[in-house]
UniProtKB/Swiss-Prot annotation:
This is FYVE, RhoGEF and PH domain-containing protein 4. It is found in: Cytoplasm, Cytoskeleton; Cell projection, Filopodium. Zn(2+) 2 binds at C582, C585, C611, C614. It holds the Pfam family RhoGEF. The modification Phosphoserine is found at S702, S716. Detected in thymus, lung, heart, skeletal muscle, small intestine, liver, kidney, spleen and testis. Expressed in all parts of the brain and in the spinal cord at embryonic, postnatal, and adult stages. Levels of expression are lower in postnatal and adult tissues than in embryonic tissues. It comes from Mus musculus (Mouse).
Amino acid sequence: MEESNPAPTSCTSKGKHSKVSDLISHFEGGSVLSSYIDLQKDSTMNLNIPQTLGQPGLTSSPPRKFLPQHSPQKQENDPDQTQGQHGCLANGVVAAQNQMECEDEKETTLSPEMAIQTAAASPDTHVLNGERNETITDSASSIANSHDENASDSSCRTPGTDLGLPSKEGEPGMDAELQERENGVNTMGLDTLDQHHEVKETNEQKLHKIATELLLTERAYVSRLDLLDQVFYCKLLEEANRGSFPAEMVNKIFSNISSINAFHSKFLLPELEKRMQEWETTPRIGDILQKLAPFLKMYGEYVKGFDNAVELVKTMTERVPQFKSVTEEIQKQKICGSLTLQHHMLEPIQRIPRYEMLLKDYLKKLSPDSPDWNDAKKSLEIISTAASHSNSAIRKMENLKKLLEIYEMLGEEEDIVNPSNELIKEGQILKLAARNTSAQERYLFLFNNMLLYCVPRFSLVGSKFTVRTRVGIDGMKIVETHNEEYPHTFQISGKERTLELQASSEQDKEEWIKALQESIDAFHQRHETFRNAIAKENDIPLEVSTAELGKRAPRWIRDNEVTMCMKCKESFNALTRRRHHCRACGHVVCWKCSDYKAQLEYDGGRLNKVCKDCYQIISGFTDSEEKKRRGILEIESAEVSGNSEVCSFLQYMEKSKPWQKIWCVIPKQDPLVLYMYGAPQDVRAQATIPLLGYVVDDMPKSADLPHSFKLTQSKSVHSFAADNEELKQKWLKIILLAVTGETPDGPSEHLATLNNLPGPKKKSEC
């Protein structure tokens, strides 16, 4: 980089020998005083330019006429020449200033008109996409050329050099007067420069800059797409074809990245390149971006599968060494920029919002009368819709990135990396011991569904915390406590543990209580909404029951769908407790619970056998409030089966007992518990298994039951067997999440399976 001004040392030792000779001849040919006056004129003119451009946001270099004639390398290597220079930093660009002093009172300064012309002629430096583009006008050079070249060289001298000029002590007050003049002239120059700069920012030049930025970022984006498509995807597919892992997994990770890459590299980028070459005759980009709209569907498919793709990369990296080896080898290359595969996979998600941002800026600078206005506006409307989906995926990715950081801080012991987990708050806190009330340092991570209570781990490398307790939000209560000895305390009471904590200040305490309470309320609201939706579908409220019951024939529950009375929950047997149907609600009940008769409107008002609940509603007889709230169509197993993560018949064996066929359900509202029923319509579960903490063994031990798996915890052993491998994998997918405290966030597919079955008797899986 060239120096803006020469150092204020003697130019006789720095300039070329020819310049020195000319300068000496110039002074020998006339009086010293007249030469000095000419010198001061040029010096004053040169002085005004850096003074004007020393403002923030403006950068300049002096006219070429005043630049030193020796090489830049010599300037950098010579320590004497750098003395006395002052660099001002303005928007990342250094503008050098060289302050010179003048002594002669007879010296004439620049007129305001010439100062304005000089300031306006200063070059503007703009930073665009990391590159500097400088436009230097010739006005400053023309001003410099109007004076003698030798005088410009001699202006390098400072007062008091060996030319015998008057000393600066001989002219008191001259510096102040000259500075005053310079300030007045430079103020006018600044105003004119700002106006000139403003005019430039509002014309088509700014539109050209936006289009240029679009082109440059598109080039960088295509290179990232090529990295994903031609490097990561191809290398992993080659490894998959060797049999290291299924090629289907690679296709799921990269989705339609090849199609996206082909569109941008073969169509959009060449179109932008061509348009920028023809910008003088066709200054528009809206028509090109409008052609992008039909191809946004490709991004919709990519965004839709992004969460699963990132999760699959994590799983494959942990479980398949060959996959991990290939990805790490590529990530070490310079082209990756020390970023992981997951970071590069985010590039297509981030690109659509980038188009939206550039188009918005483009429309702000574009005149409504422009022929490109309609195309640009229509493009923005279409791209904005796609950008909203991309922004949602970006937020999820940022959340997932934060979860990965916490996962590493916890020593990779707590499997919290799940898109359904959202970090609400984290921070240091003190825990009051129950025995001696001493305060102990702890760290909390609050998520939308749990609280991690951690202890600091003192180690030089690796994890920072150890999880002491995982407290679920479900059932959690917050109590503000008052302790005179320990202020700012509050209590967290959960199913797993109760903690008395001390915040650092009253504000910190209020923030924690607020965050915890909002998380609890949001959790209950989600589950309450879910339960209300189930109640509307499966239960008949009292008012509706009174109006509808007996007026419409019910659907009878099949006998083989229950093993116990749906009212008193007593088991059926062939001799003493047989099955009966209530003609009003269709439930299967025992003889004790069906020993009632009521007139049913749909049967012409004839008396029919009904259950006790239906009799109470039809006849108007009321029982206790508790029985009222139960409802007459409450079917426990059917309720959870119809809204479950997975449900089907499985073979079950506990310890050395024989295998038996049972109906198993993991409900959505309680996804960490496995419910086991005798039949799909039973109102009471035979047993439940809290899955959290169990160890899953999916290796079959028996040739007779090849699709079996086992759950083990301490001395408890539960063995299950599915009818086929597909059903087994569906169960294992949900159970493997549940044993680590995680819940599936995607919609379950069992409802579609149920809808395709001809009748309730064939509820083999869901």
